[in-house]
Amino acid sequence: MRRWHWAAVGLAALASLLAVLALFIDLPGAGSPAGGRQARAAIAGQLAALGDENTSFSVQNTGIDPARFVVDYYDADGTRLTEDTIPDVPAGASVAFHQDNQEGLPQGFSGSAVVTSDQSVRTVILKQIDKGNGVLSAGGDDGVTRGFSKIYLPLIYSRYGPDEGWNTRLILQNISSGATACVRMTYRNEEGQVALVEPGAGGQLQPQCPQGGLLVAAGSVLEQDHAEMAGSLPANFQGSLVVELVTGEEESVVDTQILAATVDVYHSQRASFATYRGLGWSPSEGVGDLSTGVYLPLVHKNAGEGGGWNTRFFVSPVDPAEPAELTLFYCCDSRLPGGGGSLERKTTVTTWGIVDPAQDAGLPDGFEGSLRIVSDEAVAVVATWSWVLGGVDTFAAYTGVPQAEASTAVWVPLLYRDFGYKGPTGEARGWNSWLRVQVTDGGTASVRITYHGSDLPGGSASFSEDVTGAKFFVQTEDPLLPAGFEGAAVIVSDKPVAVLAGVSSDAYQGDTDAMFTAFGPDVQATPPGSLLTISLAQGWTHTCYVGIQQSVDVALADALGEVLAVYRLRADQGYDRWFAGRPELSTLTTLNPNDALLILASAGATWVQELPGTPPTFATLVPGWNSTCYGGLTKAVELATAEIDGQFSVLYSLGANQSWRRYVPDRPELSTIMVIDQNSALLILKSTPGNVAWAFQP
């Protein structure tokens, strides 16, 4: 059984490949949020004997049109086992896939899945480990939307701690459907020294890896349990791992962006468990999850009743040979000496480092705040959160939010209020969630949170509130949400925010806390030569042309067989038109860069255009109707249109279902557009005299 979660829309329509990592099916148990649904038992071994493991993942359509999800499941050797297809997923909706309910997966399945969609998608993965006797461990992390040639894993344990109980396990996936991956793994200890390189020098080369490296076949998964590496890593090991492709000179950049990974952190004698996504980097492009600006929305020092909650974070610089100079800005506590209740610290991280706020005498006990990291080198950051006084197994981890992911529009695919299993006596509340919103500049932001779920009247409910520094929003306490709520949220702000989400259940003993960071818009490099893929609907499509000036026939070459007519609105409110095979009726002969076009097609088609090296910086609006291409970055509609505030009455966007969405300034009850995507075609009614230049701000 799958439930639909309704969420906000807004990202540009594009083909998106999402690798979902480390999937298991063992014993359904009551541990899953879907506990109580019919599921078959499947008992077998796992990567590590932590208990009866299961995973689930929720996939959200963050595009503007209905999506088709195709889920392909692969075993650890890359063999495709089964497929699950969900057609016509509405824009903004999300589907939960529970592996314990997937009849096509064998007992004891341990592998991976790849979701393919014709719309942009986002995913959250939850792992549940039933340890028996009502004890549960849970962890969560974000799914990936692209592969990389290099993966940074800043936190690795092998038999660490006084009882040698802390360990990690690695699940590395080759997300390619055809390219073999040959990988090198470099472990560094807490002094930053190389502790292990796999494969070691002098070993026999595998035929598929003539340049060296461990073989990871296309679509397959490489698994390592660091508790079992006594012969390779020393006892009490704490450090980091970098996984990188070993490539030949003839391989292209595209062929090497094929790695994704996740790490589970666990204690072998307790229920403590967490998981985090590996942070990817593309050296050839200089882009990825590492950043010179990183945000941590939740930081504790001896906080909570009893003073046991603490946060630590682990840092890996992009280049181990170049130390990273970090400036840390803690916020916001009136006891701190800086402006707005802040504290600034400086530190240097060479090849690897730990920052422990509990050891900073300048931070007062009971501190609950946020942290902004500024570095002169790109860094990967993972934070852990736990109760350090003993007797409580709660442990969670999350990746720091890179600067490019902080946004004025943020998506949260999964939230709960009093959902699911209520414990053996039925008196527990079940699964619940919270949001932690951090204003990136430490100031005050006006934030609107819209919940979306099938249990809400009309499918959504929203409220607005100011956030200074950082703030919790706890769904258990929110009167807008009914008991049994399972859904999603979109957060729109007048300043960029970084958002952390968490879920937990009081129906079990153990460690049910899981954390994941929310999603900003797609952030991808678009150098000259990059392509923009437009899906033309059967019927009308309002779209942008971003290519060079050329004839209509040449510009539309990819889709010429399906296009019946093209219209372009003029400033005098008339239309230039082009009809297939009817030059005597056509007045439109040439397309110009950033033309907004109404295209009538006899069938669905794909139109591929080459993006310009420099996007447009403004568009001129005239009194009356304007058919305009928006060239700015993806933003909340209020921010995207801030330059023309007061100049227009309504803005429309046409969906593939032939219906118009609208934005009416200061009328949220009438508005159905929340975000404007880059390269969107818009119909705007300018209601003031004279022309105005709409400048697209970065």
What is the predicted function of each stretch?
Residues 21-634, 640-698:
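Gly/Pro-rich, tryptophan- and cysteine-flecked surface segments typical
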Residues 1-12:
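N-terminal Sec-pathway targeting helices
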Residues 11-20:
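Hydrophobic membrane-insertion alpha-helices, especially the h-region
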